[in-house]
Amino acid sequence: MNSLAGLLPVIVFLAIALAIAVVARRRGERASSGGFIAEYFIGSRSLGPFVLAMTTIATYGSVSSFVGGPGQAWNVGFGWVYMAAVQVTALFLLYGIMGKKMALVSRKLGAVTVVDVIRARYHSNLLANLSALIIVVFFSATMVAQFVGGAKLFSAVTGYSYVAGLLIFGGAVVVFTTIGGFRGVAFTDALCGSAMLVGIVVLAAGILTAGGGYTAIMDTIQANHPEMMKPFADGKMPLSLYFTQWLLVGIFTFCLPQSVVRCMGYKDTRALRHAMTSGTVIIGAMMIGVTALGTLSAGVLTGDLAEYGGSVDNIIPQTIIRCLPTWLAGIAIVGPIAASISTVSSLLIASSSAFIKDLWMHRAQQMGRSIPDTTLARASQCITLALGAIVFVLAIVPPDVIWKINMFAFGGLETAFCWVLLGALFWRRATKQGALASMIGGTLAYCACMAAGFKVAGLHQIVIGLSVAFVLMVGVSLLTSSRARAHENTLQRTTSHTVPRKIPDKRSDTASAQASGTKPTQVPDSVQEIFFPDKPAVLR
C-alpha cells in the first residue's frame, strides 16, 4: 500500500538538497576567482574542515554500506562487523598519504582532476586518456548499484514502485548535481552525511525496541545462531576474507579517484587536520554502527533468507518496515538514500570532468583553441545530465547483490590507480611506461580473474590485481628510468598541457587561463620540480 507518510520525509530531504545545490552554485559564482572549470569541478579549493570531512565520508559511504553490508552482517554475524571496522582507517590514510602532496601539486599545476596530475607527471596523453576511460567505466558500474539500491529501498518502505523510486530520487540527484557542480555536491554531501547519522540512530532505536532491548536481542541470536557470535562464524568468515576485505574497503581506499579529488578542494592545512580527526571518528561510528545493526536485526528477523526475498539486500528494508512506524520509516530510509545520492553525485562530477577537462579541453589546448566559460558551463552540465540519464536507464532492470557490484568497482579502481598515483607523487623513478604497464596489466588481470572466478589461496582477486600492477610498475619503471631521466634532462621547460604557461603576449595568456579555468602561473624548469622539490613545500 502506497504511503504518503513514508514518502514525505524523502521528498522534503530531496527538496532541501536541491535548494542547497542552487545556493552553493550562486555563492560559487560570486566567490570564484579561478574560472568555471576550477569552480565546477573542485569548488575553487575552498572547502572547510566540516564540509571536507562530510563530503569524503558521504562519497565513501555508499548505499552498499547501508544495505548490502548490513545484510551480509545479518547472514554472517559479528565477524562481518569486525571486518567492517577497518573502514575507520579510510579518511586517515587518504588525508595522511594523499592530502598534502596532492593539494600542493594540484595548486602548482593548476590541476582540477586526478587525470590532470597523472598527465603532467608522466607526460603521457595515452595514460591520461586511459585513466579517464577507466574512471568512467568503473564509476558507471558503481552508480548503477547506487541507483538500484536506493530505488529498491524506496519501493520496499513506501510501497511505491521501483521505477517510481528511481524517477524520484534518481532524477533529483542528477538535477542537483548538474546545477550545483562540485561545491553543490560537497555541501549536499554534508547534508547527506548528517542524514546518514540520523538514519542510523532512528533504525537503532527501532531495532532495540522491536527486539525487546539489547540483551534480549543477543539472547535470541545466541539461541538461534550461536556461530554469529564468533569472529570466524564457523567458517563463514575465513581469515582470507578478513585479509582481502581489509585491503579492499580499508587500506587501499586512499587511492580511489573520487576520494583523491577531495584532496584538491580544501582550503588550508587547518581544514585538512580537522577533517582528518573529526572525519575518522564519524566514519568509524557510522560504518561500524550500521554494520552492527545488520547483525542485531537477526534478533528481529528470525526466519531464513528465503522468507525475505532470497537476497541480503532485502534485510535492511524489511527491518525498517517491521521495526518502525510509517513516518519514522520514512525518516530512516533517508539515511541510505542519502548515501546513494552522495556517492552518485560525486561520481557524476568526476565522470563529467573526465570527458570535459581531461579529454575535450585538453584536445582543444593541443590545437591552440580556447573554449569560453559559457560553452564549458553548458557542455559540463549537459555531460553530467547525459551520464546520469544513461545510468538511470541501465538501472531500470536491476542487478542483484549490490555490495558485490560495489566491491568489484572498488577493486578495479584501486588496481588501476594505486601504484600509478603513489609513483607519481612519491617515486622519482616511476616512468610512463611503468605506469601504463601497471594500469593496463593490473586491471586486465583483475577483471579476468573476477570473470573466471580465479583466486589464489582463497583470496579476493584484488590481491592478484594489486600484485600484478605493483610488479609491472616497479619492474618496467626500473628498466626504463635511465632513458626517462635522460629525456628529462633535455627539457628546458615543461611542455605539459596541464600546466598553463606564462606567455608574454597578454591575449594568449588570457586565453590559456580561460581554457584551463585557472590563473596564469609561472612554470618551473621541470614538472619534476613540482612533484619532487629540493625544499619541502608549505601549504598554508
Region spans (language model):
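Membrane-embedded helix-loop-helix hairpins and adjacent transmembrane boundary segments
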Residues: 1-540
